[in-house]
Amino acid sequence: MKTERFWRFNKQDKIEIDESGLVKFLEQLGYASYYTMTNKTSEPLYVFRSGYIVEPIIPSRIHTDTIHALESGIIDEDILPPAIRNEVLSKLMGSKMILKKEVTLALKELDKPMKIDTKDCAYFFYRNNAVKVTRDKIQLLPTDQLDFYVWKSQIIDRNFELIDLETITTKSEYYKFLANVSMRPVSGKLENDLERLNNLLRLQGYLLHDYKDRANPRAVVLMDVSDKGEPAGRTGKGLIIDGISKLKKTIKEDGKSFKDDNRFKFSLVTIDSKVVYLDDVPAKFNFENFFSVISEGITVELKFVNKFYIPYD
């Protein structure tokens, strides 16, 4: 790897690190800053980019991964000979300069936006293709022509294969499962209910589409109902969420132990999370406390880490 030198020898023939040069080297490796607020009133998050794929990363990982990269000889030996490399490594590890805020805050922002679904289309990303989905068609996009970045967690770890509707409705185990849980009891027997099935499919489509209308914010509530019209468990909610999680990064919270007054209640949520699932909430769960989260956004606070905000859109 060719790079400008971010080290020099002082008058005492000791290695010194040039901070501005170090920042440029980190950027060359793929590190960047990412602001969740357009007005930049909070500190940025940090990311690592490789091609069109971006991954959230904490400063300690930037330090560790950079050290490992240098140890592996990522910089060409004609620029950084092995003997000098050891001195540079010792200086970086001893001073922990990579962790200094003056260094990380100087990292440039991403040069392209993150992928955002629009009202009329959604994007999905597989190992072999990007897929653009609209009401009328499914279009394959070459990834080398994308003009945006994508979170690493959004890459679905399999190849995309377009399957016709008849095959889905006759051979897909997941479709059969959805059809079964959509059945309704009639005179002691279960009968197919196309309306309930279509509603369940629309519900999943809503969760898989990142676009959200500020004028019409929604939350999805899944409740099992017995043949007596009463709530009942163990009839498929968890499997539906598992299905969603195969396509979108989903965070599961224990609904019974979830406390709204806990400042760290969303500590499992990350900047690339797409769905938050509260599992098995109590009967008297106060849903009104979620109105601001549903209509505005989520503030995530972790112990010993700066909190950050995920806006509604």
Regions found by a protein language model. Give the residues of each.
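Alpha-helical scaffold elements adjacent to nucleotide-binding pockets in ATP/GTP-utilizing enzyme cores
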Residues: 65, 239-243, 289-293
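Conserved catalytic network of the ASCE P-loop NTPase/AAA+ motor domain
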Residues: 267-271, 283-284, 309-313
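Conserved catalytic/switch belt of AAA+ P-loop NTPases
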Residues: 249, 286-311
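N-terminal nucleic-acid engagement/recognition segments and initiation subdomains in replication
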Residues: 1-172, 180, 184
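Hydrophobic "anchor" residues on beta-strands that sit immediately upstream
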Residues: 275
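Walker B catalytic acidic pair
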Residues: 278-281
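P-loop NTPase catalytic core of nucleic-acid-dependent motor ATPases
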Residues: 33-52, 56-60, 132-272
